[in-house]
């Protein structure tokens, strides 16, 4: 998940909290991740940091990562990746800050500012070509505004796949045996993905949308896709929209994030109360809203906890304070006398 930005962020919060950090990168992102780590390392050393404050495994493997996590010199594990790796981190017996996958629904209610909602959706879904785990995975749109939504999306360079093209995209983008995204599409442009899947799209296409009838294993594109590929649902009512969003979150996105575009406060509150998500993003781009600070006052972070919903120890945005031990010297004082 967003390997370069995640590497830089973890390096920064570690150095800021006076902790050295050693990375075990995913083999598929080794080169770009190592390059990102070296940029931060060189800058840190130039500013006076210790020479080996940021390190990484040169030849990555599952065995090497497990050895690193279980090494007696490692105090805490920051686990970002698949559920298997996160579970392995929790099984080390060390404090572990694991984060989970997202399957983020974007419900666009009929009360929304549609122009802004479309702009936010495209901005978020194209950022880093959809690699951020908080990026929208499905647009859920009220029927009353669906036609206008489609016109605006097409106007700004998005492509709605035909039924036969949806099948091609499903077969190419999702590994049916593993029930997960095909790793080769992660972070790739929409035009490249379409070409590889055998779908002809206009030059400059930003996002590929696939209209689906449901959520679950029988609808492969309702999964997390980490690319500019977006599931699309039209719903007849607010209740159906919230239910469909809940289905998305429950389908391998528990505890992560959900976004809503609406100007009806009652709808926003009902949506927030229903979603089993740690971050509820309102009238903002999901990627940037979940990362925090730009569109809200959430703590800026690229390590997003999913809480007990997602099997994580934290539900917030992991940052420097999570890597600091606090000592509390408690001297005898006359405190409030609650009982005699």
Predicted features and spans:
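Solvent-exposed alpha-helices and their adjacent loops that cap or buttress functional pockets
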Residues: 15, 46-50, 68-72, 78, ...
């Amino acid at each position: 998940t967003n390997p370069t930005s995640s590497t830089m962020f973890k390096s920064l919060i570690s150095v800021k909290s006076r902790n050295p950090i050693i990375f075990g990168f995913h083999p598929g992102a080794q080169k770009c991740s190592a390059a990102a780590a070296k940029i931060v390392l060189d800058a840190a050393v130039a500013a006076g940091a210790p020479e080996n404050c940021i390190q990484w495994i040169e030849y990555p493997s599952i065995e090497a990562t497990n050895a690193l996590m279980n090494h007696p010199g490692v105090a805490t594990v920051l686990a970002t990746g698949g559920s298997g790796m996160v579970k392995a981190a929790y099984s080390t017996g060390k404090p572990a800050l694991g984060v989970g996958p997202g399957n983020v629904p974007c419900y666009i209610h009929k009360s929304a500012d549609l122009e802004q909602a479309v702009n936010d959706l495209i901005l978020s879904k194209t950022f880093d070509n959809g690699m951020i785990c908080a990026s929208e995975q499905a647009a859920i749109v009220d029927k009353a505004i669906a036609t206008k939504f489609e016109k605006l999306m097409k106007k700004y360079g998005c492509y709605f796949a035909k039924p036969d093209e949806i099948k091609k995209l499903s077969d190419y983008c999702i590994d049916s045996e593993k029930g997960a995204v095909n790793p080769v599409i992660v972070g790739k442009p929409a035009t490249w993905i379409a070409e590889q899947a055998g779908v002809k799209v206009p030059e400059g296409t930003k996002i590929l949308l696939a209209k689906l009838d449901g959520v679950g294993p029988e609808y492969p594109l309702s999964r997390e896709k980490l690319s500019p590929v977006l599931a699309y649902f039209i719903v007849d009512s607010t209740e159906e929209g919230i239910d469909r969003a809940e289905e998305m979150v429950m389908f391998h996105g528990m505890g992560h994030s959900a976004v809503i575009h609406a100007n009806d406060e009652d709808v926003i509150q009902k949506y927030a109360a229903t979603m089993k998500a740690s971050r509820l993003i309102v009238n903002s781009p999901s990627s940037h809203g979940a990362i925090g600070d730009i569109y809200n006052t959430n703590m800026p972070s690229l390590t997003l906890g999913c809480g007990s919903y997602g099997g994580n120890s934290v539900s917030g945005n992991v940052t420097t304070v999570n890597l600091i031990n606090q000592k509390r010297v408690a001297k005898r004082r006359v405190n409030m006398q609650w009982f005699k």
